[in-house]
């Protein structure tokens, strides 16, 4: 019996353990952190051996194959030992893909992944298809394949997941954009990060489709290096030669594989970045064969994604917007670009090698104040203090919201769009967004 070791017992690891057990492997799960009770119960229910708080080296190095949590960097000591030994290391998505013939619609990109993935799932589910949501959002793909298999899966993929995928094939692959992000995990080399994102196209055949943003200079440059067999489906904000998705004369238009159009005003998602997300999602659904009436309805009634330009409300005349998912500079740029009132920008957190020069002009144009929120705000001071905009330095969400109240005037917008990861002060970006919303709503009480 082959031995599979799973490192990390979160959503993906616990799900992979269940599928591996079902497929007859000897399974051992190891997590250096504390495992959540629900995942312990799931593994106990399937008689899966697990450990937490440490790694038993002998058991792990005895594996025939290792499934690694995407959160574990390749520099981790145990990963280095496994690599030196030549043990295959794969992702949960790669493993799950071996045990299903379902159609895979896969989405990656530095920004817009969650919105686009959620929109595609919303439309396909509305059409009555048997579809699952997996990857960075939804339930573990492996667990769904093991216990509630579907005919279609819509999967959000990070670069970390793609790093350990080799044989997996996306029937519809979407690459929204490539901008600097997570460079701390890629030796601060943009090409390493780009190579990871381009892995979404691997193993595609003539029967498959690759949807990408035609105006992304990095993507178009990379395409020249790849001899892709899949059908290329570029989209753009405006009509360009070769593009099969675009906006023209106030209409949202697709012309592959069938012609579809609807008034742009009917689209539920607003902002330039959401034009791209909606075009990519519409093309994917059109390729899958969603009827045009359902496609129009889905693009019109999609409610949006939590923590992504989420309107929290208007309190004491000030609008509050939660964009906690903006964990890189490019995401913050799109958020600022969509602002129509004087903005108090909340920025800061765990810096991932950010270049703030990309947003300085927009900050000068849009912002009436800046509130720094992080354990160490020195880099923010170095970049923004000289702009002549009022700034405040804070180290907790409570102090941050209080500073925003001090700076904001009626009619202004307070925008939490941090450019950074959240792990310096918060559990995750969701925790950061929830704390922000709770404190803001308390203003109105």
Model-predicted segments: where are they?
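Nucleotide phosphate-binding/pyrophosphate-handling subdomain across enzymes
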Residues: 3, 15-23, 130, 262-368
């Amino acid at each position: 019996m082959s031995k599979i070791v799973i490192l990390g017992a979160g959503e993906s690891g616990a799900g992979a353990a269940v599928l591996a057990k079902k497929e007859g492997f000897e399974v051992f799960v190891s997590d250096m952190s504390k495992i959540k009770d629900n995942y312990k119960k799931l593994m106990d229910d399937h008689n899966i051996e697990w450990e937490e708080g440490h790694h038993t080296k002998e058991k792990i190095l005895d594996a025939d194959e290792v499934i690694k949590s995407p959160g574990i960097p390749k520099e981790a000591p145990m990963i280095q030992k496994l690599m030196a030994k030549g043990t295959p290391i794969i992702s949960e998505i790669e493993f799950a893909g071996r045990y299903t013939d379902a159609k895979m619609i896969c989405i990656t990109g530095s920004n817009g992944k969650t919105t686009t993935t959620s929109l595609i799932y919303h439309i396909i589910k509305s059409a009555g298809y048997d579809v699952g949501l997996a990857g960075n959002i939804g339930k573990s793909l492996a667990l769904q394949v093991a216990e509630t298999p579907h005919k279609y899966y819509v999967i959000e993929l990070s670069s970390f997941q793609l790093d350990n995928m080799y044989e997996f094939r996306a029937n519809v692959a979407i690459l929204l954009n490539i901008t600097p992000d997570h460079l701390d995990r890629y030796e601060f080399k943009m090409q390493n990060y780009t190579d990871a994102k381009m892995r979404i196209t691997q193993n595609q055949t003539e029967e498959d489709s690759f949807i990408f943003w035609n105006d992304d200079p990095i993507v178009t440059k990379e395409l020249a290096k790849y001899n892709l067999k899949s059908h290329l489906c570029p989209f753009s904000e405006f009509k360009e030669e070769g593009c099969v998705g675009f906006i023209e004369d106030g209409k949202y238009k697709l012309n592959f594989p069938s012609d579809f159009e609807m008034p742009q005003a009917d689209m539920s998602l607003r902002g330039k970045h959401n034009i791209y997300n909606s075009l990519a999602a519409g093309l994917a659904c059109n390729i899958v064969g969603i009827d045009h009436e359902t496609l129009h309805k889905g693009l019109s009634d999609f409610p949006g994604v939590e923590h992504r330009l989420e309107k929290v409300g208007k309190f004491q005349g000030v609008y509050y917007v939660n964009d906690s998912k903006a964990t890189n500079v490019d995401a913050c740029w799109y958020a600022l670009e969509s602002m129509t009132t004087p903005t108090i920008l909340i920025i800061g957190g765990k810096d991932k090698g950010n270049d703030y020069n990309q947003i300085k002009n927009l900050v000068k144009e849009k912002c009436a104040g800046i509130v720094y929120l992080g354990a160490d705000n020195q880099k923010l001071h170095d970049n923004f203090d000289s702009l002549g905009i009022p700034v405040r330095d804070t180290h907790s969400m409570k102090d941050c919201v209080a500073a925003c109240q001090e700076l904001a005037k009626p009619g202004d917008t307070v925008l939490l769009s941090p450019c950074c990861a959240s792990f310096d002060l918060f559990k995750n970006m969701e925790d950061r967004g929830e704390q922000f919303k709770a404190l803001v709503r308390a203003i109105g009480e």
